[in-house]
């Protein structure tokens, strides 16, 4: 065997070297080296493992936090689509998420920003618009708004012509709708306009699940089941409370304190509707059924507010997705007879929105919600199997059943009127 001395060879110092033993020395040294390297190899492997753990640990922590945070966020009750809800999670919960979302949206919207010119429309969209069933008597026709004067020299069929929606009330149309192209430079842009006869309608204001944040009575967060038999239309609310301290009230109870100087849409207990420049302090008076504020007035006494501007990141007129000046915008106005007008149009600045409201007859007006997700006007027909909702103006991000199920944001419901003082029915 290698590494063992054979007997009878004498002292190792005088013995001649055995050829068979000479390789045994490096072999023995090799074993010793191998035995000496084993602890070092384990230590190296441990060091590599520690480095990997140190590198991976932050990612594991962040991933674990993200999974928990996202799950908690997505499991909260909401009416938003999962993709929109996911975007809001990034914006609100992820560090620098607001910048990331804004930057991404800016790129997307810049690529799809409206361009001037282009081909003319051959017809106007008819989404949500029902043709008139019968000709109205001349006296009733005179009570409605005049045809919207077309902007284009060659108007399309039905452009600016008011059409009734839903069943008549007291022999006349409670709700009228029309469409028209508001700007020569943007021939494919369409404005959707709805007019509500204040003598044939009654309007209620409803808190949503999260807006206003401190609702005195949260209510059903949708059109109450017991009121749907008289439902005519629903539409979106204004800017959130955090975007301008926009207060609101229902049935004499303050949700969020009203702010002096804000434009305020008010429904009085006698059934009349008004837009006022609020100066009454944080609470409403006993004659007010409901109130909803949204920024400053954009039209006053028939004239545009001189402080209007096209800044897409204006703290006064609302931040837009992607920092674009032209986005979906909505607004409400009051005409000379005290009737309510609602407008929704894509590719609008706050100035062009005000001009649309001015053109359709508003003498006072205010901006409501903006950006693609929130504009919502829905009219209803009472069919044999219940309500048939129809979107007026396209919005693929919202279903026609919005407001028939609990919604995150506040909204308005338009009803056939009931006798007596107006209150907001929560049942």
Please name every model-derived segment:
Residues 50-53, 91:
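Conserved, single-site charged/polar hotspot
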Residues 189, 260, 327, 405-409:
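Short, solvent-exposed loop/turn segments at the edges of secondary structure
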Residues 52-70:
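Hydrophobic membrane-insertion alpha-helices, especially the h-region
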Residues 387-427:
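Low-complexity, Gly/Ser/Thr/Pro-rich intrinsically disordered linker/tail segments
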Residues 341-343, 348-382, 386-398:
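C-terminal soluble interaction/assembly domains
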Residues 65-79, 83-256:
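Zymogen propeptides
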Residues 1-49:
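Terminal targeting segments of Actinobacterial cell-envelope proteins
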Residues 197-198, 205-346, 350-359, 363:
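Aspartyl protease catalytic domain
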